[in-house]
Amino acid sequence: MSKAIVLDSHLKEKGSMELPKRYEGINSHNLYLYVKHYLSSVRANTAKSKNRAEVSGGGRKPWAQKGGGRARAGSITSPVFVGGGVSHGATNNRNYNLKINKKQKRLALEYALEEKAQANKLFVVEKIAIKGVVEYNKRKHLAKEANKMFQALEQRDTLFVCMNMDEYTELAFSNLKKCLVIDVSELNAYLLAAFSSVVMEEVAFQHVVQDKTEE
């Protein structure tokens, strides 16, 4: 059974917490489906080309229908002309969102969490707190303390998951390139897969692993 590594206040290993048995044997295809769903939902639908009705000009017939020796033409906005409208071009009213049901979302999250635990990259701490926030409340101090926490983990990049994240914690991590801090309500399978390691507050971990199959 996979286990999360429990860290003390100095970020040293002091124990472990088991993941529920239902996390075993989940199909990885659920994570694939969720990643496709997530990326499609954040896709910016900005590509747009003008069709022949939207191109300016073309109010008169460019040349006589007969007698010129050229192919007949009714408007210079036709797609056959340079500067004319585009046929079958991109439109900005397309919906790229891919549907995924609640069960698949849950299974994708559980699979991603299980993968992190198997790789020994899932850590649990009592509290993700930045020292001195009451006394100093300065962004420079907050960032320095947050960076100390990140460096102590000795990980390439890290996702920090808080329960009821406060503004000081968010500010502290906001300028650090290789880590991200989020509230547990924002946690999803894509973020779990995107970061090489995950640090969760104990209450956030318990909230995530509780059985939601009946919800």
UniProtKB/Swiss-Prot annotation:
<dbReference type="InterPro" id="IPR013005">
    <property type="entry name" value="Ribosomal_uL4-like"/>
</dbReference>
<dbReference type="InterPro" id="IPR002136">
    <property type="entry name" value="Ribosomal_uL4"/>
</dbReference>
<keyword id="KW-0687">Ribonucleoprotein</keyword>
<dbReference type="Pfam" id="PF00573">
    <property type="entry name" value="Ribosomal_L4"/>
</dbReference>
<dbReference type="GO" id="GO:0005840">
    <property type="term" value="C:ribosome"/>
</dbReference>
<protein>
    <recommendedName>
        <fullName>Large ribosomal subunit protein uL4</fullName>
    </recommendedName>
</protein>
<feature type="region of interest" description="Disordered">
    <location>
        <begin position="46"/>
        <end position="76"/>
    </location>
</feature>
<dbReference type="GO" id="GO:1990904">
    <property type="term" value="C:ribonucleoprotein complex"/>
</dbReference>
<keyword id="KW-0694">RNA-binding</keyword>
<dbReference type="GO" id="GO:0003735">
    <property type="term" value="F:structural constituent of ribosome"/>
</dbReference>
<keyword id="KW-0699">rRNA-binding</keyword>
<keyword id="KW-0689">Ribosomal protein</keyword>
<dbReference type="InterPro" id="IPR023574">
    <property type="entry name" value="Ribosomal_uL4_dom_sf"/>
</dbReference>
<comment type="function">
    <text>One of the primary rRNA binding proteins, this protein initially binds near the 5'-end of the 23S rRNA. It is important during the early stages of 50S assembly. It makes multiple contacts with different domains of the 23S rRNA in the assembled 50S subunit and ribosome.</text>
</comment>
<dbReference type="GO" id="GO:0019843">
    <property type="term" value="F:rRNA binding"/>
</dbReference>
<comment type="function">
    <text>Forms part of the polypeptide exit tunnel.</text>
</comment>
<comment type="subunit">
    <text>Part of the 50S ribosomal subunit.</text>
</comment>
<feature type="compositionally biased region" description="Gly residues">
    <location>
        <begin position="56"/>
        <end position="71"/>
    </location>
</feature>
<comment type="similarity">
    <text>Belongs to the universal ribosomal protein uL4 family.</text>
</comment>
<dbReference type="GO" id="GO:0006412">
    <property type="term" value="P:translation"/>
</dbReference>
